[in-house]
Amino acid sequence: MLRWITAGESHGRALVAVLEGMVAGVEITSTDISEQLARRRLGYGRGARMSFERDAVSVLSGVRHGLTLGGPIAVEIGNTEWPKWETVMATDPVDPAQLADSARNAPLTRPRPGHADYAGMLKYGFDDARPVLERASARETAARVAAGTIARSFLRQALGVEVLSHVIAIGPSAPYEGPPPGPGDLPAIDASPVRAYDEAAEQAMIAEIEAAKKDGDTLGGVVEVVALGLPVGLGSFTSGDNRLDGQLAAAVMGIQAIKGVEIGDGFATARRRGSQAHDEMYPGPDGVVRSTNRAGGLEGGMTNGQPLRVRAAMKPISTVPRALATVDMATGDEAVAIHQRSDVCAVPAAGVVVEAMVALVLARAALQKFGGDSLAETRRNIDAYRRAVAEREAPAARGTA
């Protein structure tokens, strides 16, 4: 079973990702992880932190000479601002006099609407939102991207699967509804200021961000992740927790600020008749083919051989420059919410994080299906399965003769 967990706070010494259950022999380097983390910092509308934040990656265990060893993989991402926060975020007790002299340690008692501040303070008994926001911060997603980088390397090397994303819409801009991009389009997408696949959509998104920035506001949006090259049969119909669509939705909804997930055409299919909602099948030269992909590559909780399409809706960032009304938890008085350094829009970066979570779930499903202790063994199992599937589809291929 592939498992992952992260640790660390936004302004702590470092973030840590631990990935357990990865097979031996997968090629991965700290440079690969750094490149994906750099993609996470992309995007028009990011805040000042992105201009000086550098992700200092150290692979602590589970990899030797660029190959995974089969044991738990630990990745550390150092915080380059740690010297500024060393006293405030120290793990050992600190002299109260030192803390009293630090402006960074001022109590944060005015929770931000839409953030974890309020519920977290009440649930854990904190008088200050600092312990909540430090862990709830989207900075934690850097560790998820690190783990996801290893998963996507496994998917590429074991199955030839590619995972990519693009931004569909930002704020009220009209959503892009054209054909999804392919792996060859990813450099151009990453070169786009908003990681858009369509140039006209890109300009509309930039205009929305500029307007929100001028008004002291923030924006959300929608990203789409596409996974290409998946075999038929990852996931299962046998029980709800084995359904791949449920696993994907849970993983993506677990990302900070994500408020909605759909697979394929998702909610649009609810407004269609059945004859216009499903993907009809026909005999093809290599087996069954389809002319549409409304299901987004999943039927009955299993991959069906079509490209996987997952969309995620991100809410506007909770730290609004114009400051929203709240209650000071120390006094009970009306107040304006605390303001932490933040972005106007982080939707382009969210696409990279959703890629990582989709890759992790797909890698787990592939290892559950094909097993193996080494990449070579997993590949042998995959090859045997694909041959068996091709034999089962042979009658459909003969139907086109």
From Swiss-Prot:
Q: Which co-factors does it depend on?
A: FMNH2
Mind listing the UniProt keywords for this protein, alphabetically?
A: Amino-acid biosynthesis, Aromatic amino acid biosynthesis, FAD, Flavoprotein, FMN, Lyase, NADP
Highest rank taxon of the organism: Bacteria
> InterPro entries recorded for this chain?
Chorismate_synth, Chorismate_synth_AroC_sf, Chorismate_synthase_CS
Q: Which cysteines are joined by disulfide bonds?
A: none
Q: Where does NADP(+) bind?
A: 40, 46
Q: Name one GO cellular component term.
A: cytosol
Residues involved in FMN binding: 135-137, 256-257, 300, 315-319, 341
EC numbers:
4.2.3.5
**In Gene Ontology terms, what is one molecular function of this protein?**
chorismate synthase activity
Please give the catalytic activity noted in the UniProt record: 5-O-(1-carboxyvinyl)-3-phosphoshikimate = chorismate + phosphate
Top EC class for this record? lyase
Pfam families under this entry?
Chorismate_synt (PF01264)
Q: In which pathway does it act?
A: Metabolic intermediate biosynthesis; chorismate biosynthesis; chorismate from D-erythrose 4-phosphate and phosphoenolpyruvate: step 7/7
* Record-linked CDD domains: Chorismate_synthase (cd07304)
Which biological process annotations from GO are given for this protein? amino acid biosynthetic process; aromatic amino acid family biosynthetic process; chorismate biosynthetic process
> How is its cofactor bound, per UniProt?
Reduced FMN (FMNH(2)).
Keyword Flavoprotein carried by entry: yes
Role this protein plays: This reaction introduces a second double bond into the aromatic ring system.
- Family affiliation: Belongs to the chorismate synthase family.
Q: How does the annotation summarize its subunit structure?
A: Homotetramer.
The name on file for this protein is Chorismate synthase
Q: Which organism is it from?
A: Mycobacterium avium (strain 104)
Could you read off the lineage of the organism from its UniProt record?
A: Bacteria, Bacillati, Actinomycetota, Actinomycetes, Mycobacteriales
